[in-house]
From Swiss-Prot:
This is LexA repressor. InterPro entries: LexA, LexA-like, LexA/Signal_pep-like_sf, LexA_DNA-bd_dom, LexA_repressor, Peptidase_S24_LexA, Peptidase_S24_S26A/B/C, WH-like_DNA-bd_sf. The active site is at 138 (for autocatalytic cleavage activity), 175 (for autocatalytic cleavage activity). GO terms for biological process: DNA repair; DNA replication; negative regulation of DNA-templated transcription; proteolysis; SOS response. It comes from Janthinobacterium sp. (strain Marseille) (Minibacterium massiliensis).
Length: 219
């Protein structure tokens, strides 16, 4: 059992709550704002202390690159933890892995499925329906990297701020969702990319799913 200070416990709980509510960890700036720190640097110092104690892992260069680790207390939550595929003894779900998606066909069409993974249900904030192979770095600062496997639950509607898989005409993309009236913005988590704006009155758009977890295979 790792011994944490009261402040470290507070930050760890904040990370867990953010992961549970939104599917992803908070940024340093969000931690600082929530806990009344003067700067994101103060949050970074506490995160580094948590990492040294083995409570979290930090991915350098990403604002949301925080992963929860097993602290030996049975409270190991996901998403936010990126990990290797689990031991066969823990496998409970069989999830299709979707690769490239052809225009005009359902995302779970047989020709899109590259493989099937058996994974532990407890790894996800909600039961996923499929895994999507991430392509590109537009969601880098949310800790979602090229080649990662995004666990996705099929949905018809989403809340502002959630990370979704959306279909825009012939393209499928992973972005943060924001809707106002008939206008939708699909927001990247990388300043090198521009938001995608959708007018439901004119543009072809569909929600394919909600991100509920993230897996990374280690070689």
């Amino acid at each position: 059992m790792i011994k944490l200070t009261a402040r470290q416990e507070q930050i760890l709980n904040l990370i867990r709550d953010a992961i549970e509510n939104t599917g992803f960890p908070p940024t340093r700036a969000e931690i600082a704002t929530e806990l009344g720190f003067r700067s994101a640097n103060a949050a970074e110092e506490h995160l580094q202390a948590l990492a040294r104690k083995g409570a979290i892992e930090i991915s350098p260069g990403t604002s949301r690159g925080i992963r929860l680790r097993d602290m030996g207390n049975g409270d190991e939550r996901f998403p936010g933890r990126q990990m290797a595929l689990p031991h066969p003894a823990l496998m409970q779900l069989s999830l299709p892995l979707v690769g490239r998606v052809a225009a005009g066909s359902p995302i779970l069409a047989q020709e899109h499925i590259e493989a099937t993974y058996d994974v532990d249900r407890s790894l996800f904030s909600a039961k996923p329906d499929f895994l999507l192979k991430v392509r590109g770095m537009s969601m880098r600062d949310a800790g979602i990297l090229d080649g990662d496997l995004l666990a996705v639950k099929k949905i018809d509607t989403a809340k502002n701020g959630q990370i979704v898989v959306a279909r825009l005409g012939e393209e499928v993309t992973v972005k943060r969702y924001k809707k106002s009236g008939s206008l939708i913005e699909l927001l990247p988590e990388n300043p090198d990319f521009e938001p995608i704006r959708v007018d439901l009155a004119h543009d072809e758009f569909a929600l394919e799913g909600l991100a509920v977890g993230l897996m990374r295979t280690w070689n």
